[in-house]
């Protein structure tokens, strides 16, 4: 007995087998719909920006022991 999953786009049953060409999708159409959703940014992975306000504050760099020219020394 093989595992059966739901297609993320149309919710039809998809057997999880080696010959399931588009798994977890039921068809190329559903796979391309999902790809288009990612390309148009309907789906995103939330991340914290490394450049949030205050992280590059010169006073914080001074507190960390960095001098202005430390970044360019050889």
Swiss-Prot record:
InterPro entries: DNA_gyrase_inhibitor_YacG, Znf_NHR/GATA. Inhibits all the catalytic activities of DNA gyrase by preventing its interaction with DNA. Acts by binding directly to the C-terminal domain of GyrB, which probably disrupts DNA binding by the gyrase. Zn(2+) binds at residues 7, 10, 26, 30. SUPFAM superfamilies: Glucocorticoid receptor-like (DNA-binding domain). The lineage of its organism: Bacteria, Pseudomonadati, Pseudomonadota, Gammaproteobacteria, Alteromonadales. Its cofactor is Zn(2+). Interacts with GyrB. One of its GO terms (biological process) is regulation of DNA-templated transcription. This is DNA gyrase inhibitor YacG.
């Amino acid at each position: 007995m093989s595992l059966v999953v739901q297609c993320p786009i149309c919710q039809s049953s998809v057997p999880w087998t080696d010959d399931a060409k588009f798994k977890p999708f039921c068809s190329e159409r559903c796979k391309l719909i999902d790809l288009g959703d990612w390309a148009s940014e309907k789906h995103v992975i939330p991340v914290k920006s490394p450049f949030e306000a205050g992280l590059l504050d010169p006073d914080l760099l001074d507190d960390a022991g960095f001098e202005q020219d430390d970044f360019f020394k050889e």
